[in-house]
Amino acid sequence: MSDILKKIELYKREEIAAAKAAVSLADLKAMQAGQSAPRGFYQALTAKREAGHFGLIAEIKKASPSKGLIRPDFDPPALAKAYEAGGAACLSVLTDTPSFQGAPEFLTAARAACALPALRKDFMFETYQVHEARAWGADCILLIMASLTDDEAERLQDESFSLGMDVLVEVHDASEMERALKLSSPLIGINNRNLRTFEVGLTVSETLASMVPDDRLLVGESGIFTHADCKRLQAAGINTFLVGESLMRKDDVTAATRALLVGEAAIAAE
């Protein structure tokens, strides 16, 4: 595990302990009962693929450790609506506060503002967090293989499945991919960012994609800024993308989302 992830795990463990003391598991389950049913995150992405379209998981992210504040006028419901209007298939909403200035209420508010399924984007270590995710309205959780053992990942996956949620399993290299393929989740994200250097390169996705059987749905993550980037990854067998920063920085988020998915030329020809 990288030094960055070790530091994150330390504060997350403290956060989880404090959360458990404030809100019991029984309370979370009561909150889940008041939520609408999971919307089918994986299903929404496969529907795009089967229709011959790119599938976009559009991210709602206020800040990041490497870039600082990304969008000063941060309005999760408005962003969710803009992404939906632009053709996104799903949302990803940051709920981690120390590193990303995220919050649970951002997830709840964004999902309530649209019809898209939403991912709780956070660092997951305990099944309690899975129950939090569903209580807040999440339809999917993220598992970062670099920060989990195989047993931990499987336990979190199975807990998520038991609540009707999907699981996006994130990898950064070949050894993590081999571990991810042992899990039953069909959703595998390839993060193009090096966790040790923060450098980004699409060659990571292009290299690792060849390891994956056709029954899995691959998601390209990080370093995707243009329609040309999407086309490049499509050539490697990746038709689904998680994109945040490049869209969050645009004034017209809906137009930027459409341009990413279909290209400026297609829009100009309409």
UniProtKB/Swiss-Prot annotation:
Record's catalysed reaction(s) = 1-(2-carboxyphenylamino)-1-deoxy-D-ribulose 5-phosphate + H(+) = (1S,2R)-1-C-(indol-3-yl)glycerol 3-phosphate + CO2 + H2O
Tagged with keyword Lyase: yes
Enzyme Commission (EC) number: 4.1.1.48
Q: Which UniProt keywords apply?
A: Amino-acid biosynthesis, Aromatic amino acid biosynthesis, Decarboxylase, Lyase, Tryptophan biosynthesis
What the entry lists under SUPFAM superfamilies is as follows: Ribulose-phoshate binding barrel (SSF51366)
The record's Gene Ontology biological-process terms are: L-tryptophan biosynthetic process
To which pathway does this protein belong?
Answer: Amino-acid biosynthesis; L-tryptophan biosynthesis; L-tryptophan from chorismate: step 4/5
Provide the GO MF annotations for this entry. Answer: indole-3-glycerol-phosphate synthase activity; phosphoribosylanthranilate isomerase activity
| Pfam families given in the database record | IGPS (PF00218)
- Give a yes or no for keyword Repeat in this entry: no
> InterPro entries from the xrefs?
Aldolase_TIM, Indole-3-glycerol_P_synth, Indole-3-glycerol_P_synth_dom, Indole-3-GlycerolPSynthase_CS, RibuloseP-bd_barrel
Residues annotated as coiled-coil are: none
Specify the enzyme's EC class, one word.
lyase
Please list every transmembrane segment annotated in the UniProt record, as residue ranges.
none
Family as reported in the entry's similarity comment: Belongs to the TrpC family.
| Name of the protein this chain belongs to | Indole-3-glycerol phosphate synthase
Gene from which this protein is expressed: trpC
